């Protein structure tokens, strides 16, 4: 197959950041995606309806002229989140609340330190139909970074899912065989997003031949057996798995430093890279489900009605992009050849 037409896709997990960075990130995503779930880990974090609504307005202001792109807003759960915060957020159009263990990712220091304290919040979310999005890693310093996702399932996620069977849960950016197996065997109220980097790469691509800072993200890339498990999961065509890029921009100097930031900025190449993965797996016909239908179906939202066409044609991802402030950012897969291209 050398051409495929999909219903317009959505991105069910990304980071736009804020300020002048929005002038880069919003158009990059609006290029192909109709909707996106916007992460709330700003400084300060987006913790309530008022902050979410204000952030949404800033995103809308950064859309290209004529764009109908729709940001889907989330709030950041903390130990101070109240039931009323959840009710108010839902009334304001917020679609989900995000659970970050404290210290698990960029700007997550304000996050949850005692999971059981949030159980009444999860109960309210289940009652009113707000989704729970989970960054699934434990964060104790003595636990090996490569083991943190599997331990989170065992200690925390299984408890949440068992205690609240009516709560819709998205296990975000899964990276392990254990996560793929957990989601597959869980109820229909549990799903997962998978990033392009975790389908394309494993930890050798981060560490062999030198440290590759632009492949560094959290959760960190795992060994090959986990990459293969994720590839096998999407190849099944299961509706439990859908597209979430976790596109996460950091300026070049913040990645290429003695203590580099975590995140891959994939918005400019993500759909094309997913197409490459599905083509390599011999299941390109299953890309539309992953990119365009499984996500809205799980969220209870209508599918998009437009289409995007991809053709099998090589192109090279730019080596860097200049941000509105004049600083460069290095996109994911910079300088690499991609085999699928959006038909203009």
UniProtKB/Swiss-Prot annotation:
CDD domains: DHOase
EC number: 3.5.2.3
Alphabetized Gene3D superfamilies for the sequence: Metal-dependent hydrolases
Enzyme class: hydrolase
Biological process annotations from GO: 'de novo' pyrimidine nucleobase biosynthetic process; 'de novo' UMP biosynthetic process
One Pfam family hit: Amidohydro_1
Sites where the protein binds Zn(2+) 1: 13, 15, 98, 246
Pathway the protein acts in: Pyrimidine metabolism; UMP biosynthesis via de novo pathway; (S)-dihydroorotate from bicarbonate: step 3/3
Binding residues for Zn(2+) 2: 98, 135, 173
This protein's UniProt keywords: Hydrolase, Metal-binding, Pyrimidine biosynthesis, Zinc
Residues forming the catalytic site: 246
Source domain of life: Bacteria
Cofactor note: Binds 2 Zn(2+) ions per subunit.
GO molecular function: dihydroorotase activity; zinc ion binding
Catalytic activity: (S)-dihydroorotate + H2O = N-carbamoyl-L-aspartate + H(+)
Chain positions with N6-carboxylysine modification: 98
Record GO cellular component, one term: cytosol
Binding-site residues, substrate: 15-17, 41, 135, 218, 250, 262
Cofactor or coenzyme needed: Zn(2+)
Task performed by this protein: Catalyzes the reversible cyclization of carbamoyl aspartate to dihydroorotate.
HAMAP family documented for this protein: PyrC_classII
Subunit structure: Homodimer.
Recorded family membership: Belongs to the metallo-dependent hydrolases superfamily. DHOase family. Class II DHOase subfamily.
Alphabetized NCBIfam families for the sequence: pyrC_dimer
Protein name (database record): Dihydroorotase
Source organism (scientific name): Shewanella woodyi (strain ATCC 51908 / MS32)
Classification of source organism: Bacteria, Pseudomonadati, Pseudomonadota, Gammaproteobacteria, Alteromonadales
Record gene name: pyrC
């Amino acid at each position: 197959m050398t051409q495929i037409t999909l219903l317009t896709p959505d991105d069910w997990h990304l980071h736009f950041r804020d300020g002048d960075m929005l002038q880069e990130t919003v158009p990059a995503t609006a290029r192909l995606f109709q909707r996106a779930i916007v992460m709330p880990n700003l400084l300060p974090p987006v913790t309530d309806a008022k902050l979410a609504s204000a952030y949404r307005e800033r995103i809308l202001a950064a859309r290209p002229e004529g764009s109908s792109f729709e940001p889907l807003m989330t709030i950041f759960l903390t130990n101070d989140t109240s039931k009323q915060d959840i009710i108010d957020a839902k009334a304001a159009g917020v679609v989900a609340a995000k659970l970050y263990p404290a210290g698990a990712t960029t700007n997550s220091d304000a996050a949850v330190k005692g999971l059981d304290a949030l159980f009444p919040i999860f109960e309210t979310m289940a009652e009113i139909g707000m989704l729970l999005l989970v960054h699934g890693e434990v964060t104790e310093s003595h636990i090996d970074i490569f083991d943190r996702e599997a331990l989170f399932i065992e200690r925390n996620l299984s408890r949440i899912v068992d205690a609240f069977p009516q709560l819709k849960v998205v296990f975000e950016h899964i990276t392990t065989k254990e996560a793929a197996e957990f989601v597959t065997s869980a109820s229909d109220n549990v799903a997962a997003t998978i990033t392009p980097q975790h389908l394309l790469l494993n930890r050798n691509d981060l560490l062999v031949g030198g440290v590759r800072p632009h492949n560094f993200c959290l959760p960190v890339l795992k060994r090959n057996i986990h990459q293969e498990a994720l590839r096998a999961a999407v190849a099944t065509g299961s509706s439990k798995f859908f597209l979430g890029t976790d596109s996460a921009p950091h300026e070049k100097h913040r990645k290429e430093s003695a203590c580099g930031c975590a995140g891959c900025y994939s918005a400019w190449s993500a759909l094309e890279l997913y197409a490459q993965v599905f083509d390599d797996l011999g299941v390109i016909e299953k890309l539309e489900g992953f990119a365009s239908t499984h996500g809205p179906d799980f969220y209870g939202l209508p599918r998009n009605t437009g289409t995007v066409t991809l053709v099998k044609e090589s192109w090279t991802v730019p080596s860097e992009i200049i941000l509105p402030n004049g600083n460069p950012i290095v996109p994911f897969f910079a300088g690499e050849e991609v085999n699928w291209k959006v038909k203009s």
